[in-house]
């Protein structure tokens, strides 16, 4: 199992003022400019400004899941680009509706909002542990 030594500053599922009534991803406490990379192979289905998410990238993974990387300061990929594990997607930031620098990471079963699953469990199932 690969371990990434990052602190989770906001866990998945916490009740709050988000549109879904709970936090639909995890927030990772990283500094502005931290490299953000794909966790596996897939295709970029969205890249650029995404409203409250600020600058964001969504990757449809080969397993059919959609991974959202949000509040980026910079985006380095374009819609339609093929990615693999380690492809540089952009840099973390504080764009959109954000209270401070972090990476918001979300896993969805469908492309649209409201089909989220626990991203920590998804990563663990794919050999990655946060913390």
Task: For the regions a language model picked out, list residue spans one by one.
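Short, well-structured beta-strand-loop connectors
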Residues: 35-45, 77-92
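Residue-level detector of conserved, well-ordered beta-strand and adjacent loop positions
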Residues: 9, 29, 60, 70-73, ...
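Zn2+-dependent peptidoglycan hydrolase active-site motif and core
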Residues: 21-23, 39-76, 101
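Conserved, short, structured surface segments that act as functional micro-motifs
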Residues: 60, 81-131
């Amino acid at each position: 199992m690969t371990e990434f030594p990052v602190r989770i500053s906001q866990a998945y599922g916490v009740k709050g003022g988000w549109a879904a009534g709970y936090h639909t991803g995890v927030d990772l406490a990283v500094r502005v400019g931290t490299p953000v990379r794909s966790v596996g192979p897939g295709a970029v289905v969205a890249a650029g400004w995404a409203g409250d998410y600020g600058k964001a990238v969504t990757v449809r993974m080969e397993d059919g899941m959609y991974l959202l990387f949000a509040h980026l300061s910079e985006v380095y990929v374009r819609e339609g680009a093929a990615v693999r594990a380690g492809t540089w997607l952009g840099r973390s930031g504080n764009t959109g509706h954000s209270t401070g620098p972090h990476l918001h990471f979300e896993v969805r079963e469908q492309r649209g909002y409201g089909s989220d699953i626990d991203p920590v469990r998804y990563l663990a199932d794919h050999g990655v542990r946060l913390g």
